[in-house]
């Protein structure tokens, strides 16, 4: 059965922006892509960069450390030097709150 973790108010993340959120032992990036919300691990898989502090264009985030890029929706690597996809989470918005579902 999935557990839900409440992350933030949807109004805290403007379209085209991200917010770093700590929930328990997770450090996450909450993205608003044209009104749709997506959540990934905040840490880049290549180095110490924070994806919530990266440059966002459409559904791609560029890490602020080595400029590797990830698809925000799928976690897939878009450009090197990153080689490992970033973890994504099933995301829901309920009563104006952004939540993730975990196993």
Regions flagged by a language model, labelled:
Residues 44, 63-66:
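Short cysteine clusters
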